A protein has these predicted regions:
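Conserved acyl-donor/pantetheine-binding loop and adjacent beta-alpha core of acyl/acetyltransferases
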Residues: 65-96
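Conserved acetyl-CoA-binding loop-helix of GNAT-fold acetyltransferases
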Residues: 95-101, 105-118, 142
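Active-site rim helix/loop that mediates acceptor-substrate recognition in acyltransferases
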Residues: 30-57, 65
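Conserved GNAT acetyl-CoA-binding A-motif
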Residues: 119-132
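Hydrophobic adenine-recognition pocket in adenosine-nucleotide-binding enzymes
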Residues: 10, 94-99, 129
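A short beta-loop-alpha structural element at the N-terminal edge
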Residues: 4-20, 31
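Glycine-rich acetyl-CoA-binding "A-motif" of GNAT/NAT acetyltransferases
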Residues: 59-62, 135
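Conserved active-site alpha-helix within GNAT-family acetyltransferase domains
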Residues: 110, 131-150
Length: 151
């Protein structure tokens, strides 16, 4: 199944597909994503840090973000996380990860995560996952991520 995916750095041409995938997965629509990002945000973000996409038959079916701590320093949950867990040097924020419902359970999140780590070798990453986001918690456990504490 992993061979069914093209894993690549996102390009501006991927943004409409990323938005299409993001929108039904935001919290106010019953999904696990806490924040809805705009097309302009994705365009600016991909110039600063890698965004990895998974495509099947040319269609974006997953993505994972990386963001500098400075770019998210104004976000309350990030501020709380950094007060509780001071960031190590050269740390970046990882996530969110979004995978199309039809693709979940096939290892796509893990291969995108590994592709991102390859792009940022040796750099530590931090993320936060809402306690009620069971699918994300389970996926991250499978990927070997460790949980620290609840904020």
């Amino acid at each position: 199944m992993i061979d069914d995916y093209e894993i690549a750095l996102a390009t501006p041409e991927d943004i409409p597909g990323i938005i299409t995938l993001q929108d039904p997965n935001v919290i106010d629509r019953g999904g696990g994503l806490s924040v809805r990002q705009t097309a302009d945000w994705f365009k600016r973000s991909m110039l600063e840090m890698p965004i990895v996409v998974g495509r099947r038959d040319g269609k974006v079916v997953g993505y994972v973000l990386s963001t500098s701590l400075a770019a998210k320093a104004h976000v309350a949950i990030v501020q709380a996380m950094l007060r509780t867990f001071p960031a190590p040097p050269d740390c970046y924020l990882y996530g969110p990860v979004c995978v199309a419902e039809t693709e979940r359970g096939r290892g796509l999140a893990q291969i995108m995560f590994e592709a991102l780590r390859t792009r940022l070798p040796g750099r530590p990453a931090m993320t936060f996952i809402r306690a009620d986001n069971a699918p994300s918690l389970q996926a991250h456990r499978k990927m070997g991520c460790k949980s620290s504490e609840c904020l």
